[in-house]
Amino acid sequence: PAEEIGAGAKQFVASGKIDNIDESFAIHVNSGLPVGSFAVEGGPVNASCDIFKIKITGKSAHVGRTHLGHDALVTASEVVVALQTIVAREVNPIDRAVVGVGKLNAGTRYNIVANDAEIEGTIRAFSHETRAHLKEAVTRIAKGIAELNRCEFEIDWYDAAAPVINTPELAEEFQKVVSKVEGIDNLITKYESSMGADDFADYVVNKPGVYG
């Protein structure tokens, strides 16, 4: 329920309605597959999604007297560039991860040192460990650069979804069942996992399950 807002599964789990359920299964439409195809495999199939909003507060001043200000725009720009080093230098090269910034707002006038800046972005990962590291790294780097430039720093995180990690044994059983379904003539057991998130992950964080 309410998958489109990325919060339905959390509410469902929190309500206790799946406490007595041993396993969870889900099927999702995939327009990228030909008719009659079904894809399911064990292991990570969808990435996690966390959304961050960073607020940097400096001190405005006229550009002719920049020494009196603390530039939030320059600071935010440094943060955006530095965040790109996380995947390149802090994540195992054989792992897969994303740190993306999609929004940067700063300043009010062409000749005024920016007092405020806001950055919005997302992190994606296929393991709980990498997800936790990305979150720590974004916070650490942004905070450090803000302090270096004499600016104040705030960050808010929104937990949209954990990674979807299919239980291998159940995925094999699922494949056997699907292979017997009339109309499915192309069972795909190896495919590229998606950086898109799905809140079905909340059902399989603590209990076995499969998402196909």
Regions found by a protein language model. Give the residues of each.
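Histidine/acidic-residue-rich, glycine-tolerant segments that coordinate divalent metal ions
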Residues: 1-114, 197-198
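Metal-dependent amide/peptide-bond hydrolase catalytic core
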Residues: 74-212
